[in-house]
Regions:
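Boundary at the C-terminal end of the N-terminal hydrophobic targeting segment
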Residues: 27-29
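C-terminal cap of metal-dependent C-N hydrolases
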Residues: 41, 341, 429-435, 441, ...
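Bacterial N-terminal signal peptides that target proteins for export
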Residues: 2-16
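Metal-associated gating/positioning segment near the N- to mid-region
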Residues: 72, 77-150
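Bacterial N-terminal signal peptides
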Residues: 13-25
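Histidine-rich, glycine-flanked metal-binding segment
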Residues: 31-34, 43-88, 103
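Acidic, glycine-enriched loop/beta-strand segments at the rims
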Residues: 35, 43-55, 416-427, 475-484, ...
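Active-site neighborhoods of metal-dependent hydrolases
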Residues: 156-159, 164-191, 195-218, 229, ...
């Protein structure tokens, strides 16, 4: 009898074991296969925490799991041994709203590891009317683009139909809504006109923009009083937006410009982002500690203010920014008329030669004409000037440098230039602040085709890898974890991108894999059209756009709509 009991007990144990195997196999079979597992990586999650070893699994465009995934079924494996696995980089200020229609892959962006861009600096891609399209016709024709949208809803629909190589969000520009109502004239809006402008901001926020922006150095933006900007920012605030600004002055009156930005934030009840924070002009070098102290004091008092930087010592803007604001009244055509008129030209020269706190006089900020390099032109006749210094152009044409500047603008008021006017210690100090993220402040471009014909600031190709190479690896002014936080979690939190910017389960799988010992920028001021190296894999929404260091051509990007979006 005891033998029978023993046999029965053994049989039961065997049956239980077999049942366990069967159930385990069934459960394993029911577990969805992962699309991709990244193994053995040094995971830097974006929060600033130290790296750790682990695997990362992706399914249906999102991060499905992080940990030991050695037993997980998958369609593909990427071995990231010795490499960093990090969140995709977020560009806090890009300019790709037009170039993404020319080459939606945006090679210059993705080879830096950029997976998301926030665009729309003051003069945004929408709203549009016939007068603006006619005024900006040369730019559209340069890129062979037909503007078949009038609103952000229509523009975003065009992007989604075409396909996008990165994720893209946009501000509605305060300059743009001003142009819609007032044109390019130096005048103040009536109450009815201001209400029209506010209505345009409301519509843009419903269309999915993330906030309202200003570029207060570039006409017609300087004509706007602070009260006008508060009114527009208030509308964006109602929809959960942010106010971002290229401030009215970044040189002698930089502290007063910060005060204006803080006032707008305070009275409109809206967060403030100061774009490409800097102290420009040799006479102002060494003043970044004052800027940092002012912002730290504001933050300590409760102001929701932060900033970003591209960490180069040269800026890049329209050549026409050297001209006093009054001369821009009426737009580019009127500016050209004034530059052709000897009397008005002499007045412009006089204003540029006189230091002033009434406007950001860039001519007073440069050490000389050798500090200006021609970067982009829309008039093909000026193409031979690309990459040349103003001093060289003036000498070869037997002109005074200021006359050479005026004559270039007469031929092409859209000319853009690189200006060497910042100090390295100021740039480094700004970069080190915990509330400073990173911006590219450039359009996405390519070394090939029509986009490769310009001579951009090297930041267009190199900002993020340059920070990893110069400021992390070589100079050690940032830790790798700090840099990745500035590239990802910090901007995601600032822009309220709640499902991006950090590596954790449930987030969209925007992921970069690179070797921290070798990643670097290649673009220089003399030869800027060079892709950065070192990004071995870049995934956007789980889809590789760079695979083993090569561009795939995939267009998995999404429009990133703001909190006020109404479908």
């Amino acid at each position: 009898m005891n033998n029978n009991i023993q046999i029965t007990s053994t049989a039961i144990r065997i049956l239980v074991f077999l049942a366990f195997l069967l159930l385990t196999s069934f459960a394993f079979a029911q577990t969805p296969s992962l699309d991709l597992v990244i193994t053995h990586g040094h995971i830097i999650d974006g929060t600033g925490s130290p790296w750790y070893s682990g695997d990362l699994g992706i399914r249906d465009g999102k991060i499905a799991a992080i940990g030991n995934l050695s037993a997980a079924p998958r369609k593909r494996t990427i071995d990231a041994a010795g490499k960093v696995v990090a969140p995709g980089f977020i560009d806090m200020l890009g300019q790709s709203e037009l170039t993404i229609l020319v080459d939606p892959r945006l090679p210059s962006k993705i080879f830096q590891g950029i997976t998301s861009e926030i665009t729309g600096e003051g003069g945004s891609i929408a709203p549009l009317n016939d007068a603006i399209i006619q005024s900006d016709r040369q730019g559209y024709e340069h890129f062979k683009i037909t503007p078949d949208w009038r609103t952000f809803r229509q523009y975003f629909a065009r992007l989604e139909k075409q396909g996008m190589g990165i994720n893209l969000a946009s501000y509605v520009g305060a300059t743009q809504v001003r142009r819609m109502v007032l044109g390019d004239d130096d005048k103040q809006p009536t109450l009815a006109q201001l209400e029209q402008m506010q209505a345009l901001v409301r519509e843009a926020m419903k269309d999915g923009t993330v906030g309202v922006s200003t570029s207060l150095e570039y006409a017609p933006a300087p004509y706007a009083k602070t009260e006008e900007l508060i009114a527009l920012a208030t509308e964006a605030s109602k929809s959960g937006g942010i106010y971002s600004t290229h401030m009215r002055d970044e040189s002698a009156s930089v502290l007063e410009a910060i005060d204006e930005a803080l006032r707008i934030g305070r009275e409109a009840h809206i967060p403030v982002e100061i774009w490409h924070i800097k102290v420009a002009g040799k006479d102002n070098w060494g003043r970044m500690p004052e800027v940092v102290a002012k912002i730290n004091a504001a933050r300590a008092a409760g102001a929701d203010v932060s900033a970003d930087t591209y960490a180069y010592t040269a800026w890049y803007n329209g050549f026409s920014a050297f001209i006093p604001p009054w001369a821009h009244d009426g737009g580019d055509a009127k500016l050209v008329e004034r530059l052709k008129d000897p009397v008005t030209r002499a007045r412009i020269r006089k204003d540029m030669l006189a230091p002033s706190k009434e406007w950001d006089n860039e001519w007073q900020e440069i050490p000389g004409p050798d500090a200006i390099m021609i970067g982009a032109v829309e008039n093909p006749a000026l193409a031979p000037l690309l990459g040349k210094r103003l001093s060289e152009i003036a000498k070869s044409s037997n002109k005074d440098p200021m006359d050479a500047l005026f004559d270039i603008l007469i031929q092409d008021p859209s000319t853009e230039v690189a200006v060497f006017g910042m100090s390295q210690p100021d740039v480094t100090l700004a970069l080190q602040q915990p509330w400073v993220a990173i911006d590219n402040d450039s359009e996405g471009t390519s070394p090939e085709g029509i986009l490769g014909q310009s001579h951009p600031h090297p930041r267009a190709y190199g900002t993020f890898p340059r920070i990893l190479a110069k400021y992390v690896r070589e100079e050690k002014v940032l830790t790798l974890e700090d840099a990745i936080r500035k590239f990802s979690a910090l901007p995601a939190q600032r822009m309220r991108l709640t499902d991006r910017g950090v590596l954790k389960a449930g987030m969209w799988a925007d992921v970069v894999i690179f070797d921290p010992a070798t990643v670097h920028d290649r673009a220089t001021f003399d030869n800027p059209n060079q892709l950065s190296e070192g990004m071995e894999y870049v995934l956007i929404n789980g889809v590789p756009v760079i695979d083993q260091g090569k561009m795939t051509g995939a267009l998995p990007g999404k429009v990133l709509r703001g909190a006020g979006y109404v479908p």
